[in-house]
Structures are given as structure tokens and as C-alpha cells.
């Protein structure tokens, strides 16, 4: 799904240790009251569900301070539909905790351009299987977003928009997938209850890595439109 870099050596991470020292200096030494308060608990107003992609760091992008964001990151920033029963529901568990215990006011689903997960979905739609143990099942949730544009006829040939055209314009599916995740959020009963009561706001965002542009969802139907 991504190209390998430096296959014959492990890349150095010592600069991260230096960054921790800088973080400690910036927050613990200059603003000890804030960190003392955070050591006793958190009360972020926003849950953000973002992609694991290294190029879209939510804290950096939003300029957030410690304690401002409750963050979930997964492949392709997907929200699975609500379901009960056995299983490891990592994303659902984080959403439940953020909504029912932390009581966030906002949920942002943040998609982005050049998403590897969506690229894999488009490849699968074109007949190329995703040869990964866990990724294939996970990103299959985004197939509905693809099928908005790829409409099979009776012979099974996709004809509404070609796969090749979508591969050239993956932002269409990336944004549709964000909209799909917003609708999936409303299948969680405690999300819908607070949303219907006006106590929780849902937002869909899509960030263009190349240009820095931001698209945001319409309040009525969750479709994304250019904003910044």
C-alpha cells in the first residue's frame, strides 16, 4: 500500500526523545498549572476520528494543546456501523467513552487526500484483491462510498463511473466515505440521542495534503463542500 524506505537500515528515532524534553519544557515548566489539572482528569470538547496516516497529525493540524482533543485514529478514518455482541470494537469503544463518559460536544470525522486505505478500496473495486490479513475487511466498509459512483448493471459491469476515473479522482470517494462515517455515527443509540437533543454536533472534514485546502460537511445532509 505504501513504498518502502531505507529497507537495509532502521531509521533513527532519537529526535523523538529530544522532542519529549522540549514538550516538558514548554508545558511542565512554563504552564505547570495546566499539566497539574490534566493529571487529575480530562474534559475535551471534541472527539476527532482521523486516519492513521502519518501526514495528517490531528494535534499539529488543529494546533491543539494537551487535553483539547479526544482522538481515534484508524485506517481510512472509518466509523463502523453500530453492532452488539462479541468482538473487539476498538473504534466503537472509543466513541462510546468519548460520548457517554467524557461527554464531548463535537465529533469530527477527518478524511484526507491521497488516503492509502481508499486507494486500496478502489483497487479492490477494479478487481485487485487487498492481500492483507486485517486491512481488507476493515476498509471494505468504504466500499459503499465507492459504489455511489460505481453502479453495476445486470451483467455485473460497473458503468456509472469507471474505476479508472475514480482512481484519478480519489477525493470523490474519500469525501463520500467521510459522509458515510457520519451516517454510521447516528446508528449508535447514545450518539443519536444526544445529536437529536442538540447536545452533540457532527462534523465531516476532508484535508487536501497537497494544497492545504479544507472541505467541511453541510449541516443538513453531511455532504462535504470547500471551506478553506
Language-model segments: residues:
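Divalent-metal-activated hydrolytic enzyme cores
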Residues: 2-44, 77-105, 116-228
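Conserved H-X4-D acyltransferase segment
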Residues: 42-59
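Structural motif
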Residues: 45-48, 68-70, 105-108
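Short beta-strand segments
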Residues: 49-51, 73, 110-112, 203-208
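Gly/Ser/Thr-rich loops at beta-strand to alpha-helix junctions
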Residues: 53-55, 112-117
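Catalytic core of membrane glycerolipid acyltransferases/transacylases, capturing the structured
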Residues: 55-78
